[in-house]
């Protein structure tokens, strides 16, 4: 029996998902960010919305009842995407997830999703306060918090770590990174209101001509039908987009770190010692 237990322990140690979670827990700035995101989700005032967001953080994948899981051929036809592949159901870990592809994305390390989410949330709050003070606009705080936390959750499913410590590249759906559309599909299945779905969808672009195709694709994946796109543009949607626009900096800082650091898991061990990639970037000539 002892040998069997040892084999299970060795297998767990070699599981990339387990290893990524362990790395994220050892990165102080990433683990602090994860705990703060969890606290922010738990502080959402609306009980139903709070429950939905907390559930999504704990289970950051496309719910298995999604229509496209049972009808992949039909989904590919409706989306005009013969290469559509969905991530395995019930696979993903918010704490372990990167914020982007490991080689050429932003926050491409275990725990990167938490760091990216918290930074975006802080930036969104600052913008909301600026608009309140300057323009007298009252922003729907719960909606903005929920949108920011929700938007990247499916990265946990679309960018799994491999045995060699790599992840990515990420596929696209309807011209957006797969996690974006799949996160909207998860929101539909978790019964988020349409106006909140619109705010989530606005992260990459506030342009309705881009948002509506993303929502339509998400609706096909979730329910096998296209949804009517909300027409009302909101301040919250624009704030979400502006807050989630630091990729030029964070992608550059991570790419510089990748160029200097070892490959694979050794890179993340180095990151534990170095602090974080943006900190080193700020010290560079």
Predicted ranges, named:
Residues 6, 125, 188:
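Residue-level marker of positions within ordered structural domains that often coincide
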